[in-house]
């Protein structure tokens, strides 16, 4: 034990995680991100909310027990859609668009309310809102006119879906003037886009009549409809919207969220008629119980009740974590169950080679939507649950959203059922399947180099915003390039030509010419060659190497050649890297086909070294600086790059070695840690002075 300068005795440090705990952390982080990708990008989740929440909670518990495992790239620190590329233009939110933390029972709700009370006393009132099962949308109005609509994305940058948003009848092009509430100069308003149950059923009936597959549930259909490339398709679908919050504003400073909703309604924006303001946790519990009994009385699907502190001043005091406000929580209802016939079990190969069995069932109505597909996780889970093909099974929709198979109704068996035989070879490439190591429950395809399923995922990954940021190389494009055998692997991506793309239907017009999307892809590939070194490192799909570690390595070594030549000890000594990442980097470069990818990219002109701008003075040489919260003049990446360009280290966590913490709006726990450790805290103006002049800079008040 040690003593601080103040004489306080510090608590004992947590134990370091052992190898098994580190391995489990990585497995959980990878699995959570894979499921987030399927949910936020493909609109096709494969596990229930309950299972996802269980994985995320296990990951959170590991990090709580061993804080050194917690990285800025961890799913516990990010909004759900972070780091996934799309084919829509990026749109930066004026203020962060966060997610929500969940509670599942009265004890957890009471614990959340107790934390609120400890900070605010009895001053807080609560709003109880229905948690609509849809897709989040942010609208920006300037001088009363709709300027932009964007999806949540990673909370800082979403997808620009303005044209599609304009087709939704509930969204006004202009705000209606009000004597009580003057229209503000700037209004960023958040809401949920959804289908009413009747409209969803009508949409699916139409799709089936046209010979097209129906949507699995209203949430998926809302997300898919909002993200249509052709706004005319969106316009034909009866999307609705309800506003449930505000972001950045100019000329509008409501004292409470309740007042904000009154103003939104006065301006012609859609707000819920079911929102209730209460004073006590007991009243909150009453509203939750009421809607638990009446959730199917609403015209749209709900999967819980959102509880928010009403007073804006108290919201600011409570702040937010990196992914969710502390002043709001979603109470999620228990799942609903139904029985149906299990027709077949088939497998799917994921990005990491994991082979997952799926249950194909007779469609059944549960929790307000029709379900015909559910995950069975792995072969061990199939055996554990004792399900046979042909069984009548119990399925559950956790959170009223995603189905899972609970088990068979054994009494209904008639002797025609048969056991599921897990395939011995990969259904995509034919390679013999095996566990990654002895004792693993998951079976994997070891053909990581050329398995089409894994290669698709790697192509999609390297095109993401956290890597090369190649617009136009989405999931559909990656699939088309591989299906046409235009490229054998990602190493050949940067030598693509117009003739190559003409071999794919996706990039060819009816006249046999290169499409506009094909031309854009070639232009974006050329542009991607000039991306900084850290993005190249992320794009290589080296295990454990995310943007934070990649930046640290790029800053320290300056070139890919130097990184490859460095010893494991030299790599591990870099702040933000450590022994696990160092070992993964060294292991990666021992594989011949990995090095071949680097050689091909280098030959194609991909930048493999960073050139420092000599005009920028190294005013921050050796200083470790942490940025937290939203800055008006910098995106998170821009702030980090400004620090690195001046010789500083853009750290992800606060320690006694931190020189400064830059705090924007809603800074969260890093600000608290800085105050606790006595680290100087700068506002945005102070940050600008630091960049221009270097230290010392006086902390903000």
Curated annotation (Swiss-Prot):
- Provide a GO CC annotation, any one: cytosol
Which InterPro entries does the protein's record reference? Answer: BRCT_dom, BRCT_dom_sf, DisA/LigA_HHH, DNA_ligase, DNA_ligase_AS, DNA_ligase_CS, DNAligase_adenylation, DNAligase_N
- What region holds the BRCT domain? 615-701
Q: Sorted alphabetically, which Pfam families does this protein's record hold?
A: BRCT, DNA_ligase_aden, DNA_ligase_OB, DNA_ligase_ZBD, HHH_2, Nlig-Ia
* CDD domains registered for this protein in UniProt: BRCT_DNA_ligase_like, LIGANc
Q: Biological process GO annotation list?
A: DNA repair; DNA replication
**Catalyses which reaction?**
NAD(+) + (deoxyribonucleotide)n-3'-hydroxyl + 5'-phospho-(deoxyribonucleotide)m = (deoxyribonucleotide)n+m + AMP + beta-nicotinamide D-nucleotide
Say what happens when this gene is deleted: Essential, it cannot be disrupted.
| Keyword Cell membrane attached | no
**Alphabetized UniProt keyword annotations:** DNA damage, DNA repair, DNA replication, Ligase, Magnesium, Manganese, Metal-binding, NAD, Zinc
Positions with a binding annotation for Zn(2+): 426, 429, 445, 451
Tell me which residues this entry annotates as catalytic: 131 (n6-amp-lysine intermediate)
SMART domains listed in its UniProt record: BRCT, LIGANc
The UniProt annotation puts the region (Disordered) at: 1-23
Positions of NAD(+) binding: 49-53, 99-100, 129, 152, 192, 308, 332
State if ATP-binding is listed as a keyword. no
EC number(s)? 6.5.1.2
GO MF terms here are: DNA ligase (NAD+) activity; metal ion binding
Cofactor(s) recorded for this entry are:
Mg(2+); Mn(2+)
What is the similarity comment for this entry? Belongs to the NAD-dependent DNA ligase family. LigA subfamily.
Q: What's its job?
A: DNA ligase that catalyzes the formation of phosphodiester linkages between 5'-phosphoryl and 3'-hydroxyl groups in double-stranded DNA using NAD as a coenzyme and as the energy source for the reaction. It is essential for DNA replication and repair of damaged DNA. Probably the only ligase required for non-homologous end joining (NHEJ) repair of 3-overhangs.
What PANTHER family does the annotation carry? CHROMOSOME TRANSMISSION FIDELITY FACTOR 18, DNA LIGASE
Protein name per its UniProtKB record:
DNA ligase A
